[in-house]
Amino acid sequence: MLTVRLVGKTILASLLIEEARKLQSVTAVFFYCKYHDPQRDSFLAVARSLLWQLLRHDGKLQQDNDLLAFFYENVAASGDESLQSIKLAKDMLTIAIQKFDKVYIILDGLDECPVKEKKLISSWFCDVVDGCYDTEAEAMRCLFISQDDNDCGKLLGRLPTVKVSSSDNNSDILAFCHSWEKQIQLKFYLPEPEVQFIGTEVAKRAGGKDTVLGEEDKSNMV
């Protein structure tokens, strides 16, 4: 179990997820929390997404008819169209995780959840990982990535922590800005000194925080 507290975290989370999914011996699942989004800021939202990913991972769980029957019967018995019970979500997720030899879970943006949900998410995953250590230490790994707020600091204080400040991101952001200079220069016919100034100024104003560009933003630049 590890927590990473930093600014400009989303790109780092994406890179870690990409690398984890390349590992042949590991089942890597992930979730991006989002502030004030009911579909992405609660334990139930996390559990639903992770269950879906585990079920789709490589067909292993889809071939387990007993497990699928268990999931279906319990959700059907609840009378809800979707998974709404926190207790049932915990039970289903625990059983699903145990079906795999090694699971890596990456949760980005815990700080964007309400305090109650932060507590629920962090405490449950900590308990599950601790349980794995009692039986098979390599069975599960969990990484929390968040801004360094007071709540997460208290909830995850006992975990190994890597702190990344804005100054740690500056060189990467500057390199990214410089990589776009040539394309900007070709489109707007700018002299070399001016386009270099733009790249340096954008990096400076970013303040160490990453900016994710959509496809429309990129097309407007090139």
Show where each model-derived region lies.
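Conserved NB-ARC/NACHT P-loop NTPase core of NLR-like innate immune receptors
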Residues: 1-222
